[in-house]
């Protein structure tokens, strides 16, 4: 609980301040997330995993400099480097190790970078909160709806406690929160959206669905590598 409160304070303050503070936080969390993902496969301290970290850092440098044209080159050369290491050191690494390294760059680093990208965009100080409205809103409503009405298992092999009713409640709740949030801040925005309320509702709906898919994907990876948790870098 203490760790959760501490992290919530850091996240909220970084979103409010934005700039380099949020950028460094996203980059740091990305590297930690990649480390834990690679750790599941046992490549977190090996050359293949280190290559993934280097590609992620290079990508974040492009993000900070605003050189979005170079991002594609970073991914292309990164993929070439990963495959070169895989081929030269064969059979040290399995093909799924190489794929996991490249997937981790996108699944963790690139996805998280969009929190910063959205924050520095027009009206980003308002729009960026939709990420948390949709994800946290979905988790909260899904939990209570599942406890009260959950009867049909959604993905019993991946997450036995998740129910179809909980998923529906989570997505519905997140969408409603998006509508409420849109009403609250619509008058403060610069007019980037013609209908901010409905735009936020759609964004929250999609965000909630992605939250569910992302959670199940993380569970699937854990099942594949037969681990209970990704790591314990953060107590609690």
Q: What kind of region is each of these model predictions?
A:
Residues 209-210:
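Hydrophobic, small-residue-rich transmembrane alpha-helices and their short perimembrane loops
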Residues 1-205:
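Membrane-embedded alpha-helical bundles of polytopic integral membrane proteins
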Residues 223-236:
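Interfacial loop-to-transmembrane junctions
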């Amino acid at each position: 609980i203490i760790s959760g409160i501490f992290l919530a304070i850091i996240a909220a303050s970084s979103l409010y301040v934005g700039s380099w503070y949020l950028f460094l936080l996203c980059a740091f969390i990305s590297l930690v997330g990649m480390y834990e993902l690679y750790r599941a496969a046992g490549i977190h301290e090996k050359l293949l995993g280190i290559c993934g970290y280097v590609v992620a850092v290079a990508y974040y440098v492009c993000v900070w400099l605003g050189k979005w044209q170079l991002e594609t080159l970073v991914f292309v050369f990164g993929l070439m480097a990963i495959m070169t290491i895989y081929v030269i050191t064969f059979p040290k690494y399995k093909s799924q190790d190489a794929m996991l390294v490249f997937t981790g760059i996108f699944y963790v680093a690139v996805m998280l970078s969009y929190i910063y990208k959205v924050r520095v965009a027009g009206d980003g100080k308002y729009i960026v909160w939709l990420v948390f409205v949709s994800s946290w809103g979905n988790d909260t409503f899904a939990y209570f709806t599942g406890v009260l009405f959950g009867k049909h298992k959604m993905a019993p092999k991946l997450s036995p406690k998740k129910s179809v009713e909980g998923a529906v409640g989570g997505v519905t709740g997140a969408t409603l929160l998006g509508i409420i949030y849109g009403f609250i801040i619509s008058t403060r925005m610069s007019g980037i959206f013609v209908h901010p309320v409905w735009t936020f509702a759609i964004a929250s709906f999609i965000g909630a669905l992605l939250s569910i898919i992302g959670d199940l994907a993380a569970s699937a990876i854990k099942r594949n590598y037969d681990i209970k948790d990704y790591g314990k870098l953060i107590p609690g």
